[in-house]
């Protein structure tokens, strides 16, 4: 299987502020494979080192080292330390001769902007039929965020659900105060709090989940199948947020599901990947059958429409050759 690779860097349509900082652009690698019959496939490597994946430089080094002709045996040598590369090559290989995929729309969770902007943005998403929302916390002081959140919870209609994402920014004392506040003011609208504590505080995370009433989801703590299995073995009672583009070969998640991991505990989420990776993920969802609104409501920052023709893939690829 012959293959080529091209690096991309795209500015975000507007900066995305999280507890880890401000994102202004997104970089990655597009892959193009072609077999002896001339059938093509495409993949995307979109690492996010702040979320536990490798760096883009590590993926560039891999692409420079691999031979110009791929085989399954060669791809099997891609190390687990490069999960975004594993995903990109695996999905590219699987797509050869099968594009375009038929993909369906799934319910999407709308990501709201930080601060006061959330009080206006939810209405636009609600009018588009979205009923699940996500808001980043840990960006301002707890008092400022709780004042905004109280107004947001009062404004959200019946049936709306809200996810709070701390991106691991709280310490245990802050988390305790937040969960006590949510017990008083949550109005039954909080679906879960995502990654309240840093990933290295696993014992505190487990203790917290066992003592609070609001559900907790792990995100940065579970960037690989091995980490999900580790948390299952620890008795984790909450959700797992799966950033599929950073998770490695998709077969690793399929194996966990076959071993008994309950699909209703999984929430699939974007890593601000591009259209090639997003379309591959939505194709995989036909097998995984998600039970919750997808965390892909990020078009305000990076628009990545699903690719429905082979020409659409070719245009993306050729754009990087200009």
From Swiss-Prot:
Tell me the GO BP annotations in alphabetical order.
menaquinone biosynthetic process; phylloquinone biosynthetic process
* Pathway given in the UniProt record: Quinol/quinone metabolism; 1,4-dihydroxy-2-naphthoate biosynthesis; 1,4-dihydroxy-2-naphthoate from chorismate: step 4/7; Cofactor biosynthesis; phylloquinone biosynthesis
| Top-rank taxon | Bacteria
Catalytic function, reaction form: (1R,6R)-6-hydroxy-2-succinyl-cyclohexa-2,4-diene-1-carboxylate = 2-succinylbenzoate + H2O
Keyword Magnesium carried by entry: yes
One Pfam family of this chain: MR_MLE_C
Task: Identify the cofactor(s).
Answer: a divalent metal cation
**Keywords in alphabetical order:** Lyase, Magnesium, Metal-binding
Where along the chain is the active site annotated? 136, 243
* Top-level EC class as recorded in UniProt: lyase
Which residues does the record give as Mg(2+) binding sites?
165, 194, 219
Molecular function GO labels = magnesium ion binding; O-succinylbenzoate synthase activity
Q: What is its EC number?
A: 4.2.1.113
Q: Which residues form a coiled coil?
A: none
Extract the PANTHER family matched here.
O-SUCCINYLBENZOATE SYNTHASE, O-SUCCINYLBENZOATE SYNTHASE-RELATED
Role according to the record:
Converts 2-succinyl-6-hydroxy-2,4-cyclohexadiene-1-carboxylate (SHCHC) to 2-succinylbenzoate (OSB). Does not show N-succinylamino acid racemase (NSAR) activity with N-succinyl-L-phenylglycine as substrate.
* Assembly and oligomerization: Monomer.
Protein family per UniProt: Belongs to the mandelate racemase/muconate lactonizing enzyme family. MenC type 1 subfamily.
What is the recorded name of this protein?
A: o-succinylbenzoate synthase
Taxonomic source organism: Thermosynechococcus vestitus (strain NIES-2133 / IAM M-273 / BP-1)
| Gene coding for it | menC
């Amino acid at each position: 299987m012959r293959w080529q690779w091209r690096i991309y860097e795209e500015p975000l349509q507007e900066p995305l502020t999280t507890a880890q900082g401000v994102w202004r652009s997104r970089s990655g690698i597009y892959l193009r494979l072609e077999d002896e019959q001339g059938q093509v496939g495409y993949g995307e490597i979109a690492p996010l080192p702040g979320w536990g994946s490798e760096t883009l430089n590590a993926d560039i080094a891999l692409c420079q080292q691999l031979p110009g002709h791929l085989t399954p045996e060669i791809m099997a040598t891609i190390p687990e330390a490069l999960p975004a590369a594993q995903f990109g090559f695996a999905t590219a290989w699987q797509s050869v001769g099968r594009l375009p995929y038929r993909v369906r729309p799934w319910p999407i969770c709308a990501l709201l902007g930080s601060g006061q902007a959330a009080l206006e943005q939810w209405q636009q998403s609600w009018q588009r039929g979205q009923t699940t929302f996500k808001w980043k916390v840990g960006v301002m002081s707890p008092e400022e965020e709780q004042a905004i959140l109280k107004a947001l919870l009062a404004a959200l209609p019946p049936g709306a659900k809200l996810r709070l994402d701390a991106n691991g920014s709280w310490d245990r004392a802050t988390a305790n105060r937040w969960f006590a506040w949510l017990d008083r003011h949550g109005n039954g609208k909080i679906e879960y709090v995502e990654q309240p504590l840093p990933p290295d505080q696993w014992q505190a995370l487990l203790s917290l989940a066992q003592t609070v009433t609001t559900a907790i989801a792990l995100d940065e703590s579970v960037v690989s199948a091995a980490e999900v299995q580790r948390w299952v073995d620890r008795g984790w009672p909450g959700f797992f947020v799966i950033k599929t583009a950073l998770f490695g070969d998709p077969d690793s998640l399929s194996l966990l599901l076959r071993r008994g991991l309950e699909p209703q505990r999984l929430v699939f989420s974007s890593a601000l990947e591009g259209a090639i990776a997003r379309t591959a993920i939505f194709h995989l969802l036909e097998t995984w059958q998600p039970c919750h609104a997808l965390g892909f409501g990020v078009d305000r920052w990076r628009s990545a429409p699903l690719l429905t023709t082979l020409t659409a893939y070719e245009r993306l690829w050729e754009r990087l050759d200009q």
